[in-house]
């Protein structure tokens, strides 16, 4: 994967968020959730404010073999979390349950690989209320749409309600850990995970690592 040109372009920040106490960050997210939530409103907020480093530390949890999801705030309309990425961490290919999402980098960098589902042998499972898909297909066809590099000060990565599918990687060759902030509306308690090699998909429940099981 040749990322030299992408990395060079991303070294010039397009925004510089102001570090604020986590309480102020939470108050801002809560206030936005009380009104009409739009992709642009949350984008603008995350491009303007970030959790200051001394407060960020309390939300960092590190495991050697996978990323961790650490809740900062949640209500019925929105959730915000800090995700910690050890070296070499890779998520499964997944959906976002038909919700809006935003990701901004605080430390390190990540690669986002975007995909489109072209077809499966359980298309009727997508025609349900309340979730994006029941999953359960045993034959899937996926198309790779390319990659995005996400860095501090670079464009936020966003997902929309039309079943954005991606996976996220912290490449071994970078030899550094990464920390990102994710906001979703509404909160996501489960998603569809795709096993391309096995040609199947299934639903996976999600949890916060900084809360008791």
Can you annotate each of these PLM segments?
Residues 92-94, 112-113, 158-159, 165-172:
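Short beta-strand His + acidic residue motifs that chelate non-heme Fe in jelly-roll/DSBH
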